[in-house]
Amino acid sequence: MTTVAASTRPQRAEGRGHLAAKLFDGRTRIRELYQEGAAKIRLPDTFDASMEAVIINTAGGLTGGDRMDWSVDAGAGTRIDVTTQACEKIYKASAGTAEVTTSIEVGAQARVDWLPQETILFDRAALSRRLDVDLDEDSEFLAVEAVLLGRKAMGETVETGLFRDRWRIRRSGRLIHAEELRLSDGVAALAARQAVLGGQVAFATLLYAGPLSEAYLGKVRPLVEGSMGGASAWDGKLVVRLAAADGFSLRKILIPVISALRNGAPVPKVWNL
């Protein structure tokens, strides 16, 4: 008698969420909403013409082999703020790489603020992330991505792992900004280099693309002065890069910068929970 061992594939978290908005009676309204698997989208009430979307991974985190896909389509004249319910945790991967893709289209005279809370990488995590944005000629876009290499208060460190982050931002089909970040293998040793993070374990990149880039630069530079970071504006875009010793120290700089790039508006309320 021959015994055949059952082969089981570990359960993986997968999800897809899509939100499209249109302008109706001067307010941003839902045009399409689709949710599948572990991806959920919630739309809290707002008291102005904008829409706030909170995206949720009901799996509670990601590990090797998981996949999440998000897409946002902001119609002409709309205003959408997109954030996450909590920090996204990327756990140790036994096999494979977690993948997250985000696609955003911003129509004429529309604005999208992409404001997810921090991504927390644990030791031996593996994450590949991609952000693709298509802008109309006169639309605005703000993106914030913050990453923590473990939680310092919990004594966590990230010695090895994989983190790939790819951004492609286009306006009227023309590439205006690209990011290509890769941390792999000896992550701690790489982060310790002065030309990389200088030993800091919390870092963030902010990008604003729109007509106010030069005006925003004058507001942002005083906020980052004295920190490990800087801000520059050119060709209709503004880029801010920050690094700090831990997540709390990063937020103390990051939140005022985000507010400045939102004409004084605060970060979404879920950031404060």
UniProtKB/Swiss-Prot annotation:
GO MF term (any one): nickel cation binding
Location relative to the cell: Cytoplasm
Presence of keyword Chaperone: yes
Main subcellular location: cytoplasm
Gene Ontology CC terms: cytoplasm
Pfam family, one: UreD
Alphabetically ordered keywords of this record: Chaperone, Cytoplasm, Nickel insertion
InterPro entries found in the cross-reference section: UreD
Domain of life: Bacteria
Assembly: UreD, UreF and UreG form a complex that acts as a GTP-hydrolysis-dependent molecular chaperone, activating the urease apoprotein by helping to assemble the nickel containing metallocenter of UreC. The UreE protein probably delivers the nickel.
Function: Required for maturation of urease via the functional incorporation of the urease nickel metallocenter.
PANTHER family per the UniProt record, alphabetical: UREASE ACCESSORY PROTEIN D (PTHR33643:SF1)
Family note: Belongs to the UreD family.
Name assigned to this protein: Urease accessory protein UreD
Species name: Rhizobium leguminosarum bv. viciae
